[in-house]
Amino acid sequence: MADSMQLAGIVLAGGESRRMGRDKATLPGPRGAATLLEYVVGVLTQRCDPIFVMAAPGQPLPEVSARIIRDEIRGQGPLPATGRGLRAAAEAGARYAFVCAVDMPLLSPELIDDLVHLATETNAEVVLPWDGRSHYLASLYRTDLAERIDRLVAGGARSMRALIDASDAQQIVLPESRFLANVNTEADLRALAQARA
């Protein structure tokens, strides 16, 4: 693990995928991975242990080397799922967790290394990449933020921005932002496939 930090991985896979029209977790994966979920878990496995996949109730998932945690209620957004994942990571002894979306076909372990390095230097509660915009779902979060998330959710918050605004967050400017690309539509998927060809 980078900088010898105990680092968990959390993959948010339970989103509704409205723009895509089908479950992103089961989309074809890059570099020989059968699905996007398998690819993202494979990347996280290189830097994170344990790994948790946050999934919707009843959502079918491919077999992966990760613990599956089901949302209690469908469609609540990423904040409650992140809180449950951070709580599980804290219980497993991790101080930080890399939290990402399942729809990142160019994700790289080097991105995680860059975030861990800044977290080690600053002890920030959140370290997130910036490439003209903040990427909340490709960031490092301290696991002790689970309680704060519970309070935010109890107050009606559902977006990750609410957590960032209530935290000591540090941003890292990335010279190479392609690792942050995500797929939201069939056109995005085709464009990435063509770029890899």
From Swiss-Prot:
Entry keyword annotation includes Ribonucleoprotein: no
Residues the entry annotates as binding GTP: L12, A13, G14, K24, D71, D103
Annotated compartments: Cytoplasm
UniProt keyword terms in alphabetical order: Cytoplasm, GTP-binding, Magnesium, Metal-binding, Molybdenum cofactor biosynthesis, Nucleotide-binding, Transferase
SUPFAM superfamilies (alphabetical): Nucleotide-diphospho-sugar transferases (SSF53448)
GO cellular component, one term: cytoplasm
Signal peptide: none
Cited Pfam families: NTP_transf_3
GO molecular function, one term: metal ion binding
GO biological process, one term: Mo-molybdopterin cofactor biosynthetic process
Catalyzed reactions per annotation: Mo-molybdopterin + GTP + H(+) = Mo-molybdopterin guanine dinucleotide + diphosphate
Residues given in the record as Mg(2+) binding sites: D103
Enzyme Commission code(s) on record: 2.7.7.77
InterPro entries, sorted: MobA-like_NTP_Trfase, Molybde_CF_guanTrfase, Nucleotide-diphossugar_trans
Enzyme class: transferase
GTP-binding recorded as keyword: yes
Superkingdom classification of source: Bacteria
CC cofactor: Mg(2+)
UniProt remark on domains: The N-terminal domain determines nucleotide recognition and specific binding, while the C-terminal domain determines the specific binding to the target protein.
HAMAP family xref list: MobA (MF_00316)
Function: Transfers a GMP moiety from GTP to Mo-molybdopterin (Mo-MPT) cofactor (Moco or molybdenum cofactor) to form Mo-molybdopterin guanine dinucleotide (Mo-MGD) cofactor.
Family: Belongs to the MobA family.
Protein name (record): Probable molybdenum cofactor guanylyltransferase
